[in-house]
């Protein structure tokens, strides 16, 4: 029986398989998750401003998303600024105010 309530179960299972996590990594503050369809989420934490972050898993191209948050180094800081630029498929460059740490996450497709 390959149907269930009008659904082709083989098609449904094949669709769900692409969301399976096939590889993970976690060491210190660096991590990644790779899904069967090539989707990759990776992130980490950086403590210096004005540096290039190299991805553990290179993306297919620059069509990925980066999100980030700043952690103040001192309680007297009253505002934050984060600039992400110079995107390549293997890295990105960021700047922020001195004394802050960056927690970042990138999401996109890698070549399998």
Locate predicted features.
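A signal for long, low-complexity, Ser/Thr/Asn-enriched, surface-exposed stalk/shaft
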Residues: 1-22
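Extracellular attachment/recognition segments
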Residues: 27, 32-112
